[in-house]
Amino acid sequence: MFKYTRFERARIVGARALQIAMGAPILIDVPEGITPLDAALLEFEKGIIPLTVIRPS
């Protein structure tokens, strides 16, 4: 998996958690009653968050 800075990681997980909270489907199997933030963290750890980071070159 690509090495992200702590700022990129926070932005990715936060953006994905917001998407999940607004009704986006969760891409992994999660236990019942999990928070959107926890679901986003699990997706991030498995490397399946559908977001990309574009760095200026």
Curated annotation (Swiss-Prot):
Keywords: Cytoplasm, DNA-directed RNA polymerase, Nucleotidyltransferase, Transcription, Transferase
Enzyme class: transferase
Location relative to the cell: Cytoplasm
One annotated Gene Ontology cellular component of this protein: DNA-directed RNA polymerase complex
EC number, as in UniProt: 2.7.7.6
Main location: cytoplasm
InterPro entries, sorted: DNA-dir_RNA_polK_14-18kDa_CS (IPR020708), Pol_omega/Rpo6/RPB6 (IPR006110), RPB6/omega-like_sf (IPR036161), Rpo6/Rpb6 (IPR006111)
Molecular-function GO term, any one: DNA binding
Gene Ontology process terms (BP): transcription by RNA polymerase I; transcription by RNA polymerase II; tRNA transcription by RNA polymerase III
Catalyzed reactions per annotation: RNA(n) + a ribonucleoside 5'-triphosphate = RNA(n+1) + diphosphate
Top-level lineage group: Archaea
Complex formation: Part of the RNA polymerase complex.
NCBIfam families referenced in this protein's UniProt entry, alphabetically: PRK01099.1-3
Family listed: Belongs to the archaeal Rpo6/eukaryotic RPB6 RNA polymerase subunit family.
Function in brief: DNA-dependent RNA polymerase (RNAP) catalyzes the transcription of DNA into RNA using the four ribonucleoside triphosphates as substrates.
Protein name in the entry: DNA-directed RNA polymerase subunit Rpo6
Organism per entry: Thermococcus onnurineus (strain NA1)
Name of encoding gene: rpo6
